[in-house]
Amino acid sequence: MPRKGHVAKPEVLPDPIYNSKLVTSLINHLMLDGKRGTASKILYQALDQIKEQTGNDPIEVFEQAMENIKPALEVKARRIGGSNYQVPIEVRPDRQRTLALRWLVQYARLRGEHTMVERLSGEIIDASNNTGASIKKKEDTLRMAEANRAFAHYRW
């Protein structure tokens, strides 16, 4: 925690091709070892593949996938009287976007296709159709929050 007040988050610049900040954020989440060129090449090829497979605008498909993945609730561990409770809390919009991007990349990497381009495009298409592993992760998170609704009064 900073002693000198609030530290502003750095501004994310929109990407040069689609002019979207969301695409830049996905590139940043895809990037390994600082290789931005490789990550952006993978993403742009995946978006081209989405356009071929669906016939729709790839940015619209990606944004629909993000809306479907974003969690509304999550649980947070809270220690009260020697016991740990999983307390359901609402997720802030910036954290919703971060979790959605993280889950999208995480479950794309676990898919069985040969190249990362195929994996990423497949996961984005599945998420836009409300299927896929990242949607299952969101539903599991929501189910966990619903199961622990009895502890909601411990919110802080």
Curated annotation (Swiss-Prot):
It comes from the Bacteria. Pfam families: Ribosomal_S7. CDD domains: uS7_Bacteria (cd14869). Disulfide bonds: none annotated. One of its GO terms (cellular component) is small ribosomal subunit. One of its GO terms (biological process) is translation. GO terms for molecular function: rRNA binding; structural constituent of ribosome; tRNA binding. Keywords: Ribonucleoprotein, Ribosomal protein, RNA-binding, rRNA-binding, tRNA-binding. HAMAP family: Ribosomal_uS7_B. Part of the 30S ribosomal subunit. Contacts proteins S9 and S11. One of the primary rRNA binding proteins, it binds directly to 16S rRNA where it nucleates assembly of the head domain of the 30S subunit. Is located at the subunit interface close to the decoding center, probably blocks exit of the E-site tRNA. Belongs to the universal ribosomal protein uS7 family. This is Small ribosomal subunit protein uS7. The gene is rpsG.
